[in-house]
Amino acid sequence: FGVLNFF
């Protein structure tokens, strides 16, 4: 997970 990452 991150700001623009979903996984």
From Swiss-Prot:
Q: Where in the cell is it found?
A: Secreted
* UniProt keywords, alphabetically: Secreted
Q: Where would you say this protein principally sits, based on its record?
A: secreted
Q: Which domain of life is it from?
A: Eukaryota
The cellular component terms of Gene Ontology attached to this UniProt record, alphabetical and capped at eight, are: extracellular region
Task: Name the tissues where it is expressed.
Answer: Expressed by the venom gland.
The entry assigns this protein to a family as follows: Belongs to the non-disulfide-bridged peptide (NDBP) superfamily. Short antimicrobial peptide (group 4) family.
The entry's protein name is: Venom peptide 6
Q: Which organism is it from?
A: Tityus serrulatus (Brazilian scorpion)
